[in-house]
């Protein structure tokens, strides 16, 4: 069951990751292709009202790209504190929207110019994300991604991870988390509500006690 959950996630990511390089390449050839980036932006924020940052799991091509190409479960890296900085995230959000907004304003009415604004943004931020993935953490960019930040704000408290009392606090769930989060530290409260949780289920698959679930009643039944 656990392996099937991970395999299912892998298969979904295998279907979406290639969209990232495909859109970048297509965008430089045919700039209007850059408008596809809007779908990812709208999807991430729209879905957050119902299930938090779940879009960032496998539906986001860039998130899938980073997981498949840079994630190594045997060498999990801790997420540095500066990537959790609210000021840095707010700065990135403001910077991206100002830069993108300015380019769209200057090229308004020109589909090629407006499309290229999205292509440039996608290309530059992906390169930054690759550097962070190699040097800092595979999902480093995801911690400062403007859409991810908005999704974490709007999706706060949505679809929490329930922790049954039989949790031993072994920390295997935290080691398996692609975002570098630490669910086991909230065992006393019985809920993990970090807004950066992408609801991927890696933690539930890693738990030897089956004490974690995104469905409260199911958790209690499994861990009983």
Model-derived regions, located:
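Non-ligating segments of multi-cofactor redox enzymes
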Residues: 1-187, 195-198, 202-224
């Amino acid at each position: 069951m656990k392996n099937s959950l991970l395999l299912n996630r892998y298969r979904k990511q295998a279907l979406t990751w290639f969209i990232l390089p495909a859109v970048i390449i297509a965008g430089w050839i045919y700039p209007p292709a850059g408008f596809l980036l809007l779908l990812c932006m709208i999807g991430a924020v729209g879905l957050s009202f119902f299930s938090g940052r779940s879009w960032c799991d496998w539906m986001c091509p860039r998130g899938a790209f980073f997981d498949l190409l840079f994630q190594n479960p045997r060498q999990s890296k801790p997420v540095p504190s500066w990537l959790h900085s609210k000021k840095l995230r707010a700065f990135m959000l403001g910077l991206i929207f100002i830069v993108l907004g300015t380019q769209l304003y200057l090229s308004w009415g020109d589909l090629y110019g407006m499309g290229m604004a999205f292509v440039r943004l996608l290309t530059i931020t992906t390169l930054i994300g690759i550097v962070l993935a190699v040097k800092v953490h595979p999902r480093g960019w995801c911690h400062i991604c403007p859409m991810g930040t908005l999704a974490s704000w709007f999706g706060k408290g949505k679809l929490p991870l329930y922790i049954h009392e039989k949790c031993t606090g072994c920390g295997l769930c935290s080691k398996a988390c692609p975002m570098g989060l630490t669910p086991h530290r909230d065992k006393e409260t019985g809920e993990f509500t970090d807004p950066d949780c992408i609801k991927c289920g890696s933690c539930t698959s890693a738990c030897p006690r089956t004490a974690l679930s995104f469905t409260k009643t199911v958790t209690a039944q499994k861990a009983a």
